[in-house]
């Protein structure tokens, strides 16, 4: 089996009982390890991740999660971690700690006779995306894209890494909490297949002849399995803090969505 999950947002100040949240995620990974060949984590596994030039003691809170990933790797399970828009600031440290292969951009893989396009999903738009939305929505998307450019600016990344971790984390985790609370207050449900950016992106890829059997995304915190052509589907992974959604690909090439129940959080 190959498993896919995303958006755990570990360390979030907006998620109560953080240790119980991390424990349930570890239990979920242990369940997957029973028959997993590979596990793909498609971004935002951390609510905020920055690798400073000075040692960051706050990352100790993730030690149980790191230990589980190393244990999975020792069992021969291939671990892949994609960066998201909350945890893109890794410069080799995350790989060193976990042994996972880190992906900074979308990738296409071939498994069990199927072609899969994997991405966190932030910033993926069809080329003519402005034709689909009114001015208010276009402005919102443009703001996000500008922010994404700032986050990826190497000079600004260097300067932020120079900050004492205590100050940087206060800024980073505070920003992430504000973003999460805003999402709770103003949820953005599925927009429909004619307006959902990632669905439009996948449809355009198919029209251009870039066929994939499955497009698998995180980012949107919605659970979705949508047929966009007779032989192509878009799958969105929900999250791993509320919905506890994951997908698995069996050796016949069948992809299915599931919700992990696990033990009740205490």
Predicted regions and their residues:
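Structural motif
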Residues: 4, 40-41, 118, 216
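Short, well-ordered, mixed-charge alpha-helical segments that flank or form enzyme active sites
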Residues: 88-92, 118-119, 125-128
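Core catalytic region of metal-dependent phosphoesterases/phosphodiesterases
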Residues: 5, 10-111
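A structural signal for the main folded, soluble domain(s) of proteins
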Residues: 1, 9-12, 31, 260-266
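Histidine-centered divalent metal-coordination motifs
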Residues: 9, 85-86, 120, 218-221
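Active-site-proximal loop/helix segment associated with metal-binding centers of metalloenzymes
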Residues: 121-200
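Conserved beta-sheet core of the metallophosphoesterase superfamily
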Residues: 97, 101-105, 122, 126-138, ...
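Beta-strand-turn-beta hairpins that frame and shape the catalytic cleft
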Residues: 1-3, 109-117, 228-233
């Amino acid at each position: 089996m190959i498993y896919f999950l995303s958006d755990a947002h570990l360390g979030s100040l907006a998620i109560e009982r953080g240790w119980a949240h991390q424990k349930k995620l570890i239990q979920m990974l242990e369940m997957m390890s029973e028959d997993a060949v590979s596990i793909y984590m498609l971004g935002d596994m951390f609510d905020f991740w920055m690798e400073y030039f000075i040692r960051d003691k706050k990352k100790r809170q993730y030690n149980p999660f790191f230990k589980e990933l190393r244990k999975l790797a020792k069992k021969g399970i291939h671990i892949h971690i994609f960066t998201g828009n909350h945890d893109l600031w890794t410069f080799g440290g995350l790989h060193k700690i976990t042994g996972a292969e880190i992906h900074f951009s979308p990738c296409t893989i071939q498994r069990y006779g199927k072609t899969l396009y994997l991405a966190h999903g932030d910033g993926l738009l069809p080329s003519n995306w402005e034709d689909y939305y009114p001015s208010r929505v276009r402005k919102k998307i443009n703001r996000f894209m500008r922010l994404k450019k700032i986050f990826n600016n190497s000079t600004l990344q260097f300067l932020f890494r120079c900050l004492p971790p205590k100050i940087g984390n206060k800024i980073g985790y505070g920003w992430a909490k504000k973003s999460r609370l805003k999402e709770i207050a103003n949820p953005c449900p599925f927009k429909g297949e004619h307006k959902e950016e990632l669905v439009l992106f996948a449809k355009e890829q198919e029209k251009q002849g870039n066929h994939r059997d499955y497009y698998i995304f995180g980012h949107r915190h919605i659970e979705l399995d949508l047929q966009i052509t007779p032989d192509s589907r878009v799958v969105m992974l929900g999250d791993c803090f509320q919905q506890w959604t994951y997908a698995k690909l069996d050796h016949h090439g069948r992809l299915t969505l599931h919700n992990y129940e696990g033990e009740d959080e205490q």
